Design a protein with these regions (language model features):
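Conserved catalytic-core motifs of GNAT/GCN5-like acyltransferases
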Residues: 24-27, 147, 157, 162-176
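Conserved acetyl-CoA pyrophosphate-binding loop and the N-cap/start of the following alpha-helix
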Residues: 119, 123-128
C-alpha cells in the first residue's frame, strides 16, 4: 500500500509504478501519501527488514535493545511482519513496524507497533494498523488482540479497538 504524506490528510497514491512498487516492496504493498510532508509511504509485508535498521527504529521509540538474533527468531515465528517505509527510489527508509503472532487461522496478536517519533501524529500509525488488519482478515483471522502501553491506549480506542475491563480475561507471566 502506498500513501503520500500531505498534512493530516492521508490519501491513497499511485505515484509509484506497479512494477517499481512490486520490485522494491513486493506484492500486496500499499502506497499512500500524507499531505503536510509531501512524502510517499509504503506499507508492505513482503519487503525484507534490515535487522540493524529495525533495531535503530525501535531505539528511536525508546524501547530497550534486544539481541538481534532473538529479534530474527521472533520475526521468523511471526505470522505477519509489516514494515512502513518512507519511499525513496534507491534507499527506502524504515519508519514504522509491527508484527503479529498467532495460530494463523482464527486468532492473532499484534506486537511491537512502532512509528519513528519524527513521523508520529501524521496518521501513519493508523494506516499501518489498517494494513495489518486487512492482511489478517485476508488470511481468515477474525479475532485480533494487542497489548498497548497506557500512553497509547487512546490511539487504539480512536481506531475502534475495544478495551477489555482490567483483569477480566487477561493473565500475564514474566520471567525474572
Amino acid at each position: 500500500m502506498i500513501f503520500r504524506n500531505q498534512g493530516s490528510l492521508i490519501k491513497k497514491s499511485n505515484s509509484i509504478s506497479s512494477d517499481e512498487l512490486i520490485n522494491l516492496y513486493g506484492l500486496n504493498s500499499y502506497e499512500f501519501t500524507q499531505t503536510s510532508k509531501e512524502e510517499i509511504f509504503v506499507c508492505s509485508k513482503n519487503k525484507d527488514l534490515d535487522l540493524i535498521e529495525l533495531d535503530q527504529l525501535l531505539q528511536t521509540v525508546g524501547w530497550s535493545r534486544r539481541p538481534i538474533r532473538r529479534v530474527k527468531r521472533a520475526l521468523d515465528f511471526s505470522i505477519l511482519v509489516v514494515g512502513l517505509w518512507r519511499h525513496d527510489d534507491k534507499f527506502p527508509r524504515l519508519v514504522g513496524f509491527a508484527r503479529c503472532t498467532g495460530d494463523g487461522i482464527l486468532e492473532a496478536t499484534v506486537w511491537d507497533v512502532a512509528v519513528n517519533p519524527v513521523y508520529q501524529g501524521l496518521g501513519l500509525g493508523k494506516e499501518l494498523m489498517k494494513y495489518i488488519l486487512k492482511e489478517l482478515k485476508n488470511i481468515g483471522i477474525s479475532k485480533v488482540t494487542l497489548f498497548a502501553d497506557a500512553e497509547v491506549v487512546s490511539f487504539y480506542k480512536r481506531q475502534g479497538w475495544i478495551l477489555e475491563p482490567r483483569g477480566s480475561k487477561c493473565a500475564f507471566w514474566y520471567a525474572n
